[in-house]
Amino acid sequence: MAPIQEYVGTLIYVGVALFIGVAALLVGALLGPKKPGRAKLMPYESGNDPAGEVKRFPVHFYVVAMLFILFDVEVAFLWPYAVSAGGLGLYGFLGVLAFTLLLFVGFLYEWWKGVMRWH
């Protein structure tokens, strides 16, 4: 079997998914109501009128959330190795070691740039 024939089903699936997503966006943009107003430009406050001045959300919370996601994904990638560590041998260990070292270097760079400092 030719290599491309093995992926025809996947390519069709991705193509249909992209088509449906783009079609939904286009239909919403073309048929949706376009009534900009002052109320739509105000920040959402759980259905209540905004009280007081609007304050910017500190970016540091966003950075902490991104770091959490980064290391959460790391654990998700390391989980299969932890389950089958005995069967992977030296090459599996070296692959996981390289992956962990790469993430550790990224963590050190973030630390060096001061991302972890709370101002």
Curated annotation (Swiss-Prot):
Under InterPro entries, the record lists:
NAD(P)H_OxRDtase_bac/plastid, NADH_UbQ/plastoQ_OxRdtase_su3, NDAH_ubi_oxred_su3_sf
* Protein name, UniProt field: NADH-quinone oxidoreductase subunit 7
**Record's PANTHER family?**
NADH-QUINONE OXIDOREDUCTASE SUBUNIT A (PTHR11058:SF22), NADH-UBIQUINONE OXIDOREDUCTASE CHAIN 3 (PTHR11058)
Subcellular location per UniProt equals: Cell inner membrane
Annotated GO CC locations: NADH dehydrogenase complex; plasma membrane
Question: Does Transport show up as a keyword for this record?
Answer: yes
For membrane topology, the record states: Multi-pass membrane protein
Q: What does this protein do?
A: NDH-1 shuttles electrons from NADH, via FMN and iron-sulfur (Fe-S) centers, to quinones in the respiratory chain. The immediate electron acceptor for the enzyme in this species is menaquinone. Couples the redox reaction to proton translocation (for every two electrons transferred, four hydrogen ions are translocated across the cytoplasmic membrane), and thus conserves the redox energy in a proton gradient required for the synthesis of ATP.
Organismal lineage: Bacteria, Thermotogati, Deinococcota, Deinococci, Thermales
Question: Which organism does this sequence originate in?
Answer: Thermus thermophilus (strain ATCC 27634 / DSM 579 / HB8)
What family is this? Belongs to the complex I subunit 3 family.
Q: Which positions, given as ranges, span the membrane? A: 11-31, 59-79, 88-108
